[in-house]
Amino acid sequence: MYFKRYLQLAKPGIIFGNLITLTGGFLLATHREIGFEYLPLFVYVMIGVALMIAAGCVFNNIYDKDIDSSMTRTQNRPLVTGDISVIQATIYGTILLILSCLVLYYLVNLLTLWIIIIGFIVYVGIYTVSKRLTIHATVLGGISGAIPPVAGYTAVVNILDYNALALFLILFFWQIPHSYAIAMLYIDDYKKVKLPMLPIVKGIAYTKKIMLFYLALFVVSCALPAVLGSADLFSFIVCMLVALFWMYKSIQSYRTDTDRVFAKTVFKFSIIVITAICLTMG
């Protein structure tokens, strides 16, 4: 029972999603090779990053305890129900953070550790706080969400270059329509706790246009690894096809469907698209 609640506090769904994008960066650096040579490093960076993301989610839960208690989809979180106390959660998050730093420092490399720490600081220290204050919090949160593929890449090459920037941009531009789709789907919850989400402050119609704008930027960014010469033809074709398909389905839904169906369409295909891109990167 307690193990399940502690696992829930770490938000395993978010961890899993970020590890998929990390895999994309790792595969780009190794040209889709995870054989005996790279397997130990792949396992180490996956563990280290998973621990850091888990720590970030725990501290996010602590800070958001008050608003989580008022939203339907978060009312059963462990801190809200009292299954785990704030002190216990703080200790838990700190242990996860320390373990992550040790794994990444000793088993991966210092650059990757610093990159992941930056992601942690942006997520916990900037995004978590700013989402109560500004409509731009989602964009700020996109910075931390774009870190894992960069970490997967630097775990192998131990440098920051244009390929790392390309990975960052792909994930950053992907996250905005993905996140705004979630905001549209749970707009009533966000209204309850008075969070200044873009659909609430600027309206649904404006938000949908912004989503399509960032989706277009995402499509363009998907060509960058191939343009830079780091991704092969197969990867380029897959990336462009799925990105364009997402764009097509979103525009089609924008023209014909209700706001809620549009949000569901964007969200559903965002998961399929980023998974396909990351697992064929290289």
From Swiss-Prot:
Gene3D superfamilies named in the record: UbiA prenyltransferase
Recorded GO MF terms: protoheme IX farnesyltransferase activity
InterPro entries: Protohaem_IX_farnesylTrfase, UbiA_prenyltransferase, UbiA_prenylTrfase_CS, UbiA_sf
Species: Francisella tularensis subsp. novicida (strain U112)
Highest taxon above the source species: Bacteria
Descriptive protein name: Protoheme IX farnesyltransferase
Topology in the lipid bilayer: Multi-pass membrane protein
Gene Ontology process terms (BP): heme O biosynthetic process
EC number of this enzyme: 2.5.1.141
Keyword Transmembrane: yes
Reactions performed catalytically: heme b + (2E,6E)-farnesyl diphosphate + H2O = Fe(II)-heme o + diphosphate
Note: Carbon 2 of the heme B porphyrin ring is defined according to the Fischer nomenclature.
Sequence similarity: Belongs to the UbiA prenyltransferase family. Protoheme IX farnesyltransferase subfamily.
